[in-house]
Amino acid sequence: MRLLFLAVLRPHTGNAVTAQRVRAHLEAAGHVCILKDAFDFESPSEIANLILAENCEAALALHLYRGGRLLQGHRIPFGVIFGGTDVNEDANQAEKNTVMGRVLEEARFAVAFTESMKEMAQVQWPHAKGKIYVQSQGIATTPNAAFNWNTFLQRSEINQSADNLHIFLLICGLRQVKDPLYLVDAFSEWHQEEPNVYLVILGPEVDPVFTREVKANVKRAAGVRLIGEMPQEDLHAVVKNCFAVVNSSVSEGMSAAILEAMDLEVPVLARNIPGNAAMVKHEVTGLLFSNPQEFVHLAKRLVSDPALEKEIVVNGKEYVRMYHSWQVERDTYQQLIRKLEGSTED
């Protein structure tokens, strides 16, 4: 089949990485997958022209509101994948909620990353009950073997001679829902006590206004650094070399950065929100914090307790192997896409 796949494709963001992985799964099954950025289209009529020009027989959208709404009414069957902010944020706005409900009426299937995301969607849109499937994200990490960690530290203006250096890495696009400033003050205070701990915030500048605020705050915070986005392989190499990966988001669908850290055998400290708590079991596969002070307390504990670190790393790696298999994800999407074969009247 010739498939149109609409997603939000800001480079090096979670949704873009997911979209590329799903496209690879579908192409491996022999489909032609035309991946387009939903933000490049203003109206369904532009999509109608694209469907005609590309001779698309079916479609898929990642993110119910940004992608899904553009696929309505074209008389080609489509499926949708929940992105995270669609269920966690957009569903709270009446107008967007109604639009997404209509998208779900027309979609042949919908994929949620977690059981809790599926349950939230079913509460919002009860009519979609029978068509929501759960498929967690499949994880495959590819760290760049040639990556130079010392050069990275130099670029980050981190004192490499600091004895027993501990780098905490927060990977996120600079936008409010990721709350990158949540830990900055508390971390900075800790750095002043212990100059060998650093927080590195790494990711693309998504929201320009908010980015300015982040830069201004980081500039005056001792022990906190801000680094722009980088290719996936280099990012995985940074993760592999850091002490721990941090997530401080206000809401999450399913953080690929957390799962990739687990796969690369690096401990995870995550804010205690539903999307994170679905993957991180406290003191088993990672550590969950509810405020900045608790984060610092847990981070200190992790630094001083190698046995805890080892246990978390072993359990995290096993969790990803068991529940985030790339092959299982491939099989699921290749099966679901068959629901789009046949006439629109099915």
Curated annotation (Swiss-Prot):
Similarity section: Belongs to the glycosyltransferase group 1 family. Glycosyltransferase 4 subfamily.
Keyword entries, A-Z: Glycosyltransferase, Secreted, Signal, Transferase
PANTHER family, A to Z: GLYCOSYLTRANSFERASE 1 DOMAIN-CONTAINING PROTEIN 1, PTHR46660
Entry's localization field: Secreted
Enzyme class: transferase
Coiled-coil portions: none
InterPro entries to which the protein is assigned, alphabetical: Glyco_trans_1, Glycosyltransferase_G1
GO molecular function: glycosyltransferase activity
Protein name according to UniProt: Glycosyltransferase 1 domain-containing protein 1
Gene name in the database record: GLT1D1
Signal sequence interval, chain numbering: 1-16
Top-level taxon: Eukaryota
GO cellular component: extracellular region
EC number, as in UniProt: 2.4.-.-
Taxonomic lineage of the native organism: Eukaryota, Metazoa, Chordata, Craniata, Vertebrata
